[in-house]
């Protein structure tokens, strides 16, 4: 897409996963469930079953070695984490992302079916913020969702931590199923994490 920004914008502005749009979600469901079904047909030499999964825990490192992709992602840019929408494309909010993810049967990809979403800390400072969040997650599970890994942070704190890491040694974020000190992460990983808050 180098020097071809109008061309890149054509697919980039098309409907994207994570916005509760069947035009995008149902083909993804079909491909994922087909692949999982094929994997489950086979056994190891010892007779054990293979487990299928949508496992992509390293969006920055894996993105470095990947050329541009048809949806408009540039070469070397991070790729989405597991079931999560691509950074900057979740335009219909968390509820829509939950609905997209719940369309795929979580039992077909038991190894990893995590939906990682970010939330502004201010949501939880409102009177009923925690209760509303709890209900949101319960609803996700009630419609067939698998796992959900939330991150609740203040983006301004993340940016300040990049400038003054000594002042933010206790800032913890969830990355790929584990908790990490934000300031200990490489700058590229920090930048990708902050970019997850685009369009929220």
Where are these regions (language model features)?
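Acidic, glycine-enriched catalytic cores built around paired aspartates
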Residues: 1-200
